[in-house]
C-alpha cells in the first residue's frame, strides 16, 4: 500500500483542501450524520490518499480516531472477486466483529463512487488485492465534531507521516 498524508496533499493540491473545508459539504455531511461536522485540525489526518496496487495489498481492520470518513474512489476494481472490497460491521465497536461469521458486510465500489462512514464506531477493512495489475485509489477525508479534535491513537502518524 502506498499512502499520502494530508500535509503532502495540502502542499501539492489546492483543490482537495478547498473541497475538504467547503461549507456546503460540511453542512451536507452534518445533516446526513446528524452531527456538527467540522474539519479535523491535524493536517496529517484531514485528508489522505490510500493506493492498493500489489497483490496482497490491504488496509487492515481498524476504527478511526474521528467520527466521520468521506471516502471517494478514484480507481476501483471492476470485479469484486479481485478484492479491494470494503468490509465493515456497523455499530459493532470491536474489531472482533469482523471475524465473526455472517457479521461483516461487504461493499463493492466503482470509480467515482463514495461513501460516508461512522468510522469511529464501525470496524472496517479492505480485502486484499488478488492479482497483478490492479489498483484501488481512494481519497479519505476525516471529519469530526467541535469537541473531538484530539486523535485517540498514534496510528495515522505511523501510516502517513513523512520520513526524515
Task: Annotate each PLM feature.
Residues 17, 50, 59, 124-127:
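Flexible, active-site-adjacent loop/turn segments at secondary-structure boundaries
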Residues 1-45:
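Signature of the catalytic double-stranded beta-helix
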Residues 6-19, 56-61, 79-90, 142-151:
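Short N-terminal helix-initiation segments at or just after the protein's N-terminus
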Residues 15, 25-28, 73, 111, ...:
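Short, hydrophobic/aromatic alpha-helical segments in well-folded domains
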Residues 85-164:
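Catalytic core of Fe(II)/2-oxoglutarate
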Residues 30-45, 50-116, 120:
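Catalytic core of non-heme Fe(II) oxygenases with the double-stranded beta-helix
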Residues 12, 19-22, 52-55, 64, ...:
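Surface-exposed loop/turn and secondary-structure junction residues enriched for glycine/proline
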